[in-house]
Amino acid sequence: GNSFFGGNIQNAAIAENNSNTLAISNYNRLKISNDGGLTFTEVSQSLPNQFITDIAFDPKDDDTIIVTYGTYGNNSQKVYMSSNQGSSWQNITHNLGNMPIRSVVIDHTDDSTIYLGAEIGVYKKSMSENTWELYNENLPNTTVMELEVVYGSNTLRGTTWGRGVWEYSLTGRENFPSILTTRISNQPTDTQPKEGIDQFVTSMIEYDGDLNSVYVEWI
């Protein structure tokens, strides 16, 4: 339990560019913190009174948040987006059917592609589009419980209900092989690395094309 909701925190997300900005939810309530969790502001007053299943920040904009709902009802209230950290919300359910949405991730592309793990399959659209597209290449007809963007291999990975883990190429990205090797300058020991000492990470990939930009995420 916790004093924020009087119950368990069921979902949490941390902004990509500022780890002091985070969002947490319990059932239908959503709160935002900008001081690393010391204080929270509730931002769910205008959101549906339904169970929140997931939260995601836009990796390019910490003010943009998407929340998903796990309801079966014919209410067109499955996905909501805020561009001002919850001060106001926009319903972006659009053409999705009457099914629960289990998971949401946002890719670090120019268009900020949104992926949804749904009761049946995966759906995607860019941040600016108004239509969701089924993204189900070779995926079994099953519930997608969790999604994750795997930057090292340019793939979207999803866990399903009883049908294993599946992986497929991200949209809007040029394919390239996975990272071949990664090493750091000082291998961790009981005494290393010392605080304040820089660590250098070297990764090797095999690629024949020209790279205009490279995005690196340290997890």
Task: Please place each PLM-identified region on the residue numbering.
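Short, solvent-exposed loop/turn segments at conserved positions within beta-propeller repeat blades
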Residues: 24, 72-76
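Residue-level signature of beta-propeller blades and closely related beta-rich strand-turn architectures
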Residues: 28, 71-72, 120, 162, ...
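Blade-level signature of beta-propeller repeat domains, shared across WD40, Kelch, NHL, RCC1
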Residues: 142-173
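A short loop-to-beta-strand structural motif that recurs across blades of beta-propeller domains
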Residues: 29-32, 77-81, 121-123, 164-166
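Structural signature of eukaryotic scaffold interfaces centered on beta-propeller domains
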Residues: 10-17, 55-60, 104-109, 148-151
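Conserved blade-ending motifs and adjacent loop-strand segments that build the rim/top face
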Residues: 49-50, 93-103, 132-151
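Conserved Ser/Thr-centered positions that define the repeating blades of beta-propeller domains
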Residues: 1, 33-34, 82-83, 89, ...
